[in-house]
């Protein structure tokens, strides 16, 4: 039953592990066990940076080094990794300690992004660099090839507002759906609703502002304009 459960995640990610022990370790947070995903995260971080650097270098041949670095930072940062994790519903598969479960750890950006890096490290150990490159690029494809240097300087809420205004749609409404965790370590869940389109998306963050930005980014993804 457990293997079938993990198979759903692997299908979403587009990669089937040969060694399920590696996958389980990649999903295990330090709050649950000393045999956790931190070493895999260390490995995956370096591999992710290499893969994204390689993709940017070969696909943006006229962009100078400084701009390439800016683009890479945007793509490998924790918020972006957490968004990809949510596309896979990764939080539902994380192995967390009781304390993290109670405080909403499965929705926390830092835990999700670290797990994504660990999974990348795990795929590398389970296969090879070429296969890992193929899988990671499949996750990043839309983000990678629709990037705009101008838009990198604008936050998601601004970009969403400009897009909606430009298409004569109503402006988005943001409201708090949930708040979890202790007062010093809260996690906000924000709903972004666009009335004209009858569309709503969810964002998460440690502050209301960050959660609103996260929700706006999900809306941009919905419209395929990120």
From Swiss-Prot:
Q: Which domain of life is it from?
A: Bacteria
UniProt domain DRBM: residue ranges: 155-225
Q: Which Pfam families match?
A: dsrm, Ribonucleas_3_3
Catalysed conversion reaction: Endonucleolytic cleavage to 5'-phosphomonoester
The chain positions of domain RNase III read 6-128
Biological process terms from the Gene Ontology for this record are: mRNA processing; regulation of gene expression; rRNA processing; tRNA processing
Q: Which SMART domains does the entry mention?
A: DSRM, RIBOc
Matching NCBIfam families = RNaseIII
Q: What is this protein called?
A: Ribonuclease 3
What gene is this protein translated from? rnc
């Amino acid at each position: 039953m457990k293997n079938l459960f993990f198979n759903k995640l692997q299908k979403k990610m587009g990669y089937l592990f040969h060694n399920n022990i590696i996958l389980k370790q990649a999903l295990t947070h330090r709050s649950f066990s000393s045999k956790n995903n931190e070493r895999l995260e260390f490995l995956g971080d370096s591999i992710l940076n290499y893969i994204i650097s390689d993709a940017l270098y070969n696909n943006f041949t006229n962009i100078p080094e400084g701009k390439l670095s800016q683009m890479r930072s945007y793509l490998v940062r924790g918020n972006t990794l957490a968004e990809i994790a949510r596309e896979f519903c990764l939080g539902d598969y994380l192995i967390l300690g009781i304390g993290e479960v109670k405080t909403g750890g499965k929705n926390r950006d830092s835990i999700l992004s670290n797990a994504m890096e660990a999974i990348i490290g795990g795929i590398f150990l389970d296969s090879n660099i070429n296969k890992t490159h193929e899988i990671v690029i499949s996750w990043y494809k839309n983000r990678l090839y629709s990037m705009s240097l101008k838009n990198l300087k604008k936050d998601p809420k601004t970009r969403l507002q400009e897009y909606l205004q430009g298409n004569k749609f109503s402006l988005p409404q943001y409201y708090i759906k949930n708040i979890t965790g202790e007062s010093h370590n809260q996690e906000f869940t924000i709903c972004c609703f666009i009335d004209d389109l009858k569309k709503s998306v969810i964002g998460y963050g440690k502050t209301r502002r960050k959660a609103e930005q996260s929700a706006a980014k999900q809306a941009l993804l919905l419209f395929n304009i990120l």
